[in-house]
């Protein structure tokens, strides 16, 4: 995947004559020590990130960690002290004000925690407001605003006013306003944190659905671990202005970089984080490839040689066909039938995206290890009772 947005050795130091801080940074002084000596506040320190096109990239951290400063550096709402911010390879820290306005008009948009809707304007006019300030013609901005409202399910409220909407609906208008310019990159600064938990979950689901359709590059700032795990392809953890770890949720959960990160993830229910594909074992043992010359007799010998009671049949293209057993193969042989006759009726098969929390009852009741398939019904692997229990037991080992 191509890199859409890249940050290289980025610093933001607040205060007069910020360059004074670098000699203390080089000596290894902490953020607090630098503030005490110089009166300068270190917002972001030597941050480097590479964000891929089409991913939802979550930046997390405690209050004061630098995450909100970071997101404002990405569109130059805040000027960097040192370092690069590259969009499609162009360093926006070095472009002119006119070029920056063009980038903000066409490439990058932002959704804030505050809805910031104009109470005297309709939903449609609020959605089109940014385009109006940018000088886009009335008809064009109306069409784009209506399309954005359709994307967030508010086209029927185009002529309503903000006070007629719920909190979740008002935040959808804020999202539509950003989507109206059809940006390549969407920055979201704790955009859902002011919402009630139920509405927040609804908005997270809405964002994931929109992403599946449009594949924008989204940088999402959050302090909510559940939110980050729910929507993020990758997560960056910030501490005292530094990026201390970047990875997928399960990479960070399995290998936290330090105690700060470990504390963030302590108590995480991994049954909600990991899915069937994460623990499925792809093994040739018990795997039967359906070919013209491979019938019940060959399959039976294979299972007996491998001391397996059950086998998993796949065909060309790794397509999953079904499950057979020693008994079903013997029955097919006794009637001189093909391997199709040995397939067990209605075997339990699970989708690769199924959370581990939903697997326990299914796997526990199954007579054999459960086959896992992807959305194209391709064979991913199997999950046995022992494998599932071992995976769930990792929660205690990693977070205890």
Swiss-Prot record:
Superkingdom of origin: Bacteria
Keyword Acyltransferase set for record: no
Domain named CBS: residues: 280-341, 343-400
GO molecular function, one term: ATP binding
Keyword set includes Repeat: yes
SUPFAM superfamilies: CBS-domain pair (SSF54631), P-loop containing nucleoside triphosphate hydrolases (SSF52540)
Principal subcellular localization: membrane
Keywords: Amino-acid transport, ATP-binding, CBS domain, Cell inner membrane, Cell membrane, Membrane, Nucleotide-binding, Repeat, Transport
Membrane topology note: Peripheral membrane protein
GO cellular component: plasma membrane
Compartments reported by the entry: Cell inner membrane
Binding site for ATP: 61-68
Domain ABC transporter, first and last residues per copy: 29-265
Induction text: Induced in response to increased extracellular osmolarity, this is the first gene of the proU operon (proV-proW-proX). Osmoregulation requires curved DNA downstream of the transcription start site in this gene, which is repressed when bound by H-NS. H-NS may act indirectly to influence the local topology of the promoter.
PANTHER family in the cross-refs: GLYCINE BETAINE/PROLINE BETAINE TRANSPORT SYSTEM ATP-BINDING PROTEIN PROV (PTHR43869), GLYCINE BETAINE_PROLINE BETAINE TRANSPORT SYSTEM ATP-BINDING PROTEIN PROV (PTHR43869:SF1)
Function description: Part of the ProU ABC transporter complex involved in glycine betaine and proline betaine uptake. Probably responsible for energy coupling to the transport system.
NCBIfam families: PRK10070.1, proV
Recorded family membership: Belongs to the ABC transporter superfamily.
Protein name from the UniProt record: Glycine betaine/proline betaine transport system ATP-binding protein ProV
Source organism of this protein record: Salmonella typhimurium (strain LT2 / SGSC1412 / ATCC 700720)
């Amino acid at each position: 995947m191509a890199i859409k947005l890249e940050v290289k050795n980025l610093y933001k130091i607040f205060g007069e004559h910020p360059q004074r801080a670098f000699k203390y940074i080089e000596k290894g002084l902490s953020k607090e020590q630098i503030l005490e000596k110089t009166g300068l506040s270190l917002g972001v320190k030597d941050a480097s990130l590479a964000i891929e096109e089409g991913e939802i990239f979550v930046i997390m951290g405690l209050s004061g960690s630098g995450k909100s400063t970071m997101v404002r550096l990405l569109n130059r709402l805040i000027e960097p002290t040192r370092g690069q911010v590259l969009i499609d390879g162009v360093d926006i820290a070095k472009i002119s004000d006119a070029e920056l306005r063009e980038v903000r008009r066409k490439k990058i948009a932002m959704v804030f925690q505050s809805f910031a809707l104009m109470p005297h304007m309709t939903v449609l006019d609020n959605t089109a407001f940014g385009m109006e300030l940018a000088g886009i013609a009335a008809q064009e901005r109306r069409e784009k605003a209506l399309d954005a409202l359709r994307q967030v399910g508010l086209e029927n409220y185009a002529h309503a006013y903000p006070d007629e909407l719920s909190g979740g609906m008002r935040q959808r208008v804020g999202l539509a306003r950003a989507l109206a310019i059809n940006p390549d990159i969407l920055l979201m600064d704790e955009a859902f944190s002011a919402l009630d938990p139920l509405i927040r979950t609804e908005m997270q689901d809405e964002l994931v659905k929109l992403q599946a359709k449009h594949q924008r590059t989204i940088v999402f700032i959050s302090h909510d671990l559940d939110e980050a795990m729910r929507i993020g392809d990758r997560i960056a953890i910030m501490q005292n202005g530094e990026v201390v770890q970047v990875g997928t949720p399960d990479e960070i959960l399995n290998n936290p970089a330090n105690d700060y990160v470990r504390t963030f993830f302590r108590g995480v229910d991994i049954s909600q984080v990991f899915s069937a594909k994460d623990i499925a074992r792809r093994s040739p043992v018990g795997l039967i490839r359906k070919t013209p010359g491979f019938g019940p007799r060959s399959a039976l010998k294979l299972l007996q040689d491998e001391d397996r009671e059950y086998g998993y049949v796949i065909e060309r293209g790794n397509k999953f066909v079904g499950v057979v057993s020693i008994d079903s193969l013997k029955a097919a042989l006794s009637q001189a039938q093909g391997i199709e006759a040995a397939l067990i009726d209605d075997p339990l098969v699970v989708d690769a995206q199924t959370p581990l929390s939903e697997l326990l009852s299914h796997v526990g009741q199954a007579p054999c290890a459960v086959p896992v398939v992807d959305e194209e019904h391709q064979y991913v692997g199997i999950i046995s009772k022992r494998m599932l229990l071992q995976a769930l037991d990792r929660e205690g080992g990693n977070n205890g």
